[in-house]
A protein has these predicted regions:
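Juxtamembrane intracellular "pre-TM" segments in multi-pass secondary transporters
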Residues: 1-9, 190-219
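Intracellular juxtamembrane helix-capping segments at the cytosolic ends
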Residues: 33, 115-129, 317-330
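Helix-to-loop junctions at the C-terminal end of transmembrane segments
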Residues: 61-74, 264-277, 361
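C-terminal ends and interior cores of transmembrane alpha-helices
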Residues: 83-98, 287-299
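Cytoplasmic helix-loop-helix junction between adjacent transmembrane helices
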Residues: 105-144
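C-terminal membrane-cytosol helix-exit motif in multi-pass small-molecule transporters
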Residues: 157, 175-195, 383-388
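A late C-terminal transmembrane helix in Major Facilitator Superfamily
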Residues: 330-366
Length: 398
């Protein structure tokens, strides 16, 4: 491993590319699955079930992926995920052509296996550099999502009318992206694979790991931070269509939202090292509050644009910070089960918010959705304050 700047690490650069391809898949799915679902669903409130299928599939896959990572190692497990990405994209394409709503939901559910793998890229990044650079490595790999920010929404927009079936071209292109990912992953060397693999029963029981205050707050920050972001992002294409805004505007808003999610990755790691994890996560909570306040002022393009951009930056600070917190709470031989637990809570929260976003925005409107988002944001802020007080009390002289 190297002590140089993370970007100069060849393995890390290749993993950043894979992260970009992963987010291209995610952003494209968010941009089109709700709209394709709306055109195929028996009733409008079911429009985001394909989006929900993606995250529920991820939740169901977390334990399978943990066992796969432990048995096969990082590289092969990640490549299996990319293979599933190819096949599931083709299944979604067939569902769109055959106008089969439930087949579309099944396709996105299967694609969740890829998502469960991709969510581990950030943890794998920490293994590709030394301990002092770990926060920066995680931050830089998350920054690779900028590739998805640029390609995803534009891919959806450019390929929307490429065939008679709307967005068929996007699904077919995602299958090609999966193949490219398999090829790139082949050239990444994961040092962890050289070590003796551990059983998932090694180390402390998961119940002990889960009871640590730092791990509890890491889960809350990651799960609720992702949940609020997903709640508002998944609803945005539907909300903008209901408000009469063209899809080109939706693509623009999503592009800059995802740029907001990942562009800070170039410096979030440095900010964490300088100011501390909890303070940066606290800024993320504040940005979420500001996002909601702006979203509640109206439904014009500039309000969607600014709110979603700030939502993205807030998510970055919360999610990067939560990842850094989590890595202080487990030992190397506890890695797979601890990471699987975090991702299970993340996917579970995303599943709930994916369904809730479609149901709320189509039945109660954009404003009610934003008012409801205040609750998890407030809970996250209180959790950060609680952990800060725990640390302050433990350092107090006795």
């Amino acid at each position: 491993m190297t002590s140089k700047h993370p970007l100069l690490n060849r393995n890390l650069v290749l993993l950043i590319i894979c992260q970009g391809l992963f987010l291209t898949n995610n952003v494209t799915f968010i941009a089109i699955n709700g709209l394709v679902g709306l055109s195929l669903a028996p009733v409008s409130w079911m429009a985001t079930l394909p989006v929900m299928g993606y995250v529920v599939g991820g939740a169901f896959s977390t334990s399978i992926v943990a066992k796969s990572q432990n048995y096969f190692g990082r590289k092969i497990s990640f490549q299996l995920g990319l293979l599933v990405a190819m096949l599931s994209a083709l299944l979604c394409a067939y569902a769109a052509v055959s106008k089969n709503f439930w087949l579309l939901v099944m396709g996105t559910f299967i694609a969740g296996y890829y998502s469960a793998n991709g969510q581990l890229y950030r943890f794998a990044a920490a293994e590709l550099t030394d301990l002092k650079q770990r926060d920066k490595a995680v931050s830089w790999v998350l920054a690779g999502g900028i590739l998805g920010a640029v390609i995803g929404p534009n891919l959806a927009s450019w390929t929307r009318d490429l065939f008679d079936t709307a967005f068929l071209g996007a699904y077919l292109t995602l299958s090609i992206a999966g193949f490219i990912g398999i090829f790139v992953m082949q050239f990444i060397h994961f040092p962890q694979e050289l070590k003796t693999q551990h059983s998932l029963s090694d180390g402390r029981p998961l119940s002990v790991i889960l009871r640590q205050p730092v791990f509890v707050v890491a889960i809350i920050g990651a799960a609720l931070g992702y949940g609020v972001m997903n709640l508002l992002m998944a609803a945005t294409p539907l909300a903008m269509q209901i408000c009469g805004l063209p899809f080109s505007d939706t693509a623009l808003v999503l592009e800059w939202h995802v740029i907001g999610m990942f562009a800070p990755g170039f410096f979030t790691g440095s900010l964490i090292q300088r100011f501390g994890t909890l303070k940066i996560m606290g800024v993320g909570v504040l940005l979420n509050f500001i996002c909601i306040a702006i979203a509640l002022t109206g439904t014009n393009l500039h309000q969607f644009f600014i709110a979603l951009f700030l939502l993205g930056v807030g998510w970055n600070f919360l999610f990067t910070g939560a990842t850094s917190l989590a890595m202080t709470a487990y030992q190397p031989n506890e890695r797979d089960k601890a990471q699987a637990a975090i991702n299970f809570f993340v996917f579970g929260t995303m599943a709930f918010t994916s369904f809730g976003s479609g149901a709320l925005v189509t039945s109660h409107g954009w404003s009610i959705l934003n008012w409801g988002s205040l609750i998890p944001v407030a809970i996250t802020g209180l959790a950060l304050y609680w952990l800060a007080q725990q640390r302050k009390n433990s350092q107090a002289p006795t």
